[in-house]
């Protein structure tokens, strides 16, 4: 769907050896934003992508820009305390604000929308989330009336969140970068990246490859798992007016784009059984019988065990190597927050061990 409305810039593959200040590995939203901000700061930066820019998860997003990541704040407050939970909230609010500012100059269908997390049957969960947000100084609303085709126990509302066309935005941010497509990094030797047709020698490296590929350090394969979800883009369906997601992991999400309803769900842990396309198709047929499926796609997301992305030094033993991963299905604000933090780190404006 997004690929039909965006013309991504094209870059050739690396041929020969190059040097740079910073190498960014991975050409999704996080990698593009890192390279974009470093270029703006006057640093020499190379972006290496194994396929095409935005060929992975970024091209298969529902593109909600929100600091409301499910009912996350009650858990963060209990697990990490008010200071760190507040840091998570403020980092994502800052990411939303950065998108808002950039989108004034980029034609990408940016629209402010209220975001809602609803529960079918557990009002208590919603009340706990509202109490946690109040402790963090954030005003959220409550409603039990949503324009969805089923009753809910209620919903937590964040006002003035946003949605956009992610590839039109990414295409604008990626123009003018020193980038190489079809250039998979086979291994790292310190901060030098070996590819099929040349080596990129950098002072610092940011790994933004969805799942970190360097298994010798960081043990990310032990700290994350994969979750698969599905989306139908329906013509002649309802205009729901906002962005809605079930607090349950297997629930449904709704938002409109390009005159269509994006219906998400059927989620399951990768390798396990789940509802998949059949569940979404049955729901659409039952509740939107006149709708027509224009597009369909699936996405696979990296989920962290504690619900917090990994953004910062790759590991304690890898100097000048940084990572952004584990966005827990909230890739748009997480990618922006990661780019803002990591580009400050590589410029020395933020200590590597500084709190987020």
Predicted segment positions?
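Glycine-rich active-site loop/strand segments that organize a redox cofactor
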Residues: 60-91
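Glycine-rich FAD pyrophosphate-binding loop
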Residues: 40-60
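Helical element adjacent to the flavin cofactor pocket in flavoenzyme catalytic cores
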Residues: 130-133, 155-204, 208
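N-terminal Rossmann-like FAD-binding beta1-loop-alpha1 element of flavoenzymes
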Residues: 18-47
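Extreme N-terminal leader/targeting segments of oxidoreductases
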Residues: 1-22
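Flavin-dependent oxidoreductases
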Residues: 188-256
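Flavin (FAD/FMN) cofactor-binding and adjacent substrate-gating region
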Residues: 1-4, 71-78, 97-169
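C-terminal catalytic lobe of FAD-dependent flavoproteins
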Residues: 248, 277-279, 288-356
């Amino acid at each position: 769907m997004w690929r039909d409305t965006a013309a991504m810039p094209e870059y050739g593959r690396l041929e020969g050896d190059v040097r740079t200040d910073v190498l960014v590995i991975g050409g999704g939203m996080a990698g593009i934003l890192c390279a974009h901000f470093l270029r703006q700061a006057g640093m020499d930066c190379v972006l290496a992508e194994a396929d095409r820019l935005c060929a992975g998860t970024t091209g298969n997003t529902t593109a909600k820009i929100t600091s409301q990541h499910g009912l996350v704040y009650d858990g963060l407050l209990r697990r990490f305390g008010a200071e760190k939970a507040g840091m998570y909230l403020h980092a994502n609010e800052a990411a939303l604000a950065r998108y808002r500012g950039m989108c004034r100059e980029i034609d990408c269908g940016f629209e402010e929308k209220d975001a809602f997390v609803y529960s079918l049957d557990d009002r208590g969960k919603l009340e706990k989330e509202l109490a946690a947000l109040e402790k963090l100084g954030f005003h959220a609303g409550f409603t039990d009336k949503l324009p969805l085709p089923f009753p809910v126990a209620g919903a937590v509302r964040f006002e003035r969140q946003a949605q956009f066309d992610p590839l039109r935005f990414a295409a604008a941010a990626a123009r003018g970068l020193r980038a190489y497509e079809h250039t998979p990094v086979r291994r790292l030797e310190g901060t030098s990246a070996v590819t099929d047709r040349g080596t990129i020698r950098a002072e610092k490296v940011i790994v933004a490859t969805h799942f970190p590929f360097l298994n010798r350090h960081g043990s990310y394969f032990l700290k994350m798992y994969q979750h698969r979800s599905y989306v139908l883009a329906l013509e002649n369906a309802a205009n729901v007016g906002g962005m809605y997601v079930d607090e349950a992991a297997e629930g449904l999400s709704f938002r409109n784009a390009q005159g269509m309803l994006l219906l998400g769900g059927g989620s399951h842990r990768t390798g396990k059984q789940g509802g998949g396309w059949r569940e979404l198709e049955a729901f659409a047929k039952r509740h939107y019988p006149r709708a027509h499926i224009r597009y369909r796609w699936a996405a696979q997301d990296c989920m962290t065990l504690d619900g917090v992305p990994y953004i910062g030094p790759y590991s304690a033993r890898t100097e000048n190597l940084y990572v952004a991963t584990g966005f827990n299905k909230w890739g748009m604000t997480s990618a922006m927050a990661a780019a803002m933090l990591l580009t400050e780190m590589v410029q020395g404006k933020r200590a590597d061990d500084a709190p987020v």
